[in-house]
């Protein structure tokens, strides 16, 4: 079976892992997934992540999930721009996310939160929203 949206798969694994109270989730790595993980760590949504090379040459990324008083830190994580419907926003159209959340964008200056994009004056593709 081919995977049409690896980012949606990553977000679903995080969501399912937290619902099942897993300490970590592992998935096949890519540069985009690594950058999304970096932003999630910087914003305090995951404890840490690490990348390892498997014997077959592929790289995997393991995300250490974060809990607060036994409850998942991530209340919701949702894919916005998808292969069938890309969503782009200019920095002027970036608004706050309910519940102190962040939108993660792919911009010409790299992967960043909507707050960073607004400060830098760049727009881009809205990958997902996290709160």
Curated annotation (Swiss-Prot):
The keyword rRNA-binding applies. Keywords: Ribonucleoprotein, Ribosomal protein, RNA-binding, rRNA-binding. This is Small ribosomal subunit protein uS8. Belongs to the universal ribosomal protein uS8 family. PROSITE patterns: RIBOSOMAL_S8. NCBIfam families: PRK00136.1. One of its GO terms (biological process) is translation. It holds the Pfam family Ribosomal_S8. InterPro entries: Ribosomal_uS8 (IPR000630), Ribosomal_uS8_CS (IPR047863), Ribosomal_uS8_sf (IPR035987). The lineage of its organism: Bacteria, Pseudomonadati, Pseudomonadota, Gammaproteobacteria, Legionellales. PANTHER family: 40S RIBOSOMAL PROTEIN S15A. GO terms for molecular function: rRNA binding; structural constituent of ribosome.
């Amino acid at each position: 079976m081919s995977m049409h949206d690896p980012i949606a798969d990553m977000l679903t694994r995080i969501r399912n892992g937290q619902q099942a109270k897993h300490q970590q989730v592992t998935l096949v790595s890519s540069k985009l997934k690594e950058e999304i993980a970096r932003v999630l760590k910087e914003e305090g949504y995951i404890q840490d992540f690490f990348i390892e090379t498997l014997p077959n040459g592929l790289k995997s990324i393991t995300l250490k999930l974060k809990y607060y008083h036994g409850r998942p830190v991530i209340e919701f994580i949702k894919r916005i721009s998808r292969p069938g419907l890309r969503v782009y926003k200019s920095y002027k159209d970036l608004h706050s996310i309910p519940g102190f959340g962040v939108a993660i964008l792919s911009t010409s200056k790299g992967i960043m939160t909507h707050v960073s994009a607004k400060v830098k004056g760049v727009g881009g593709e809205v990958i997902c929203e996290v709160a």
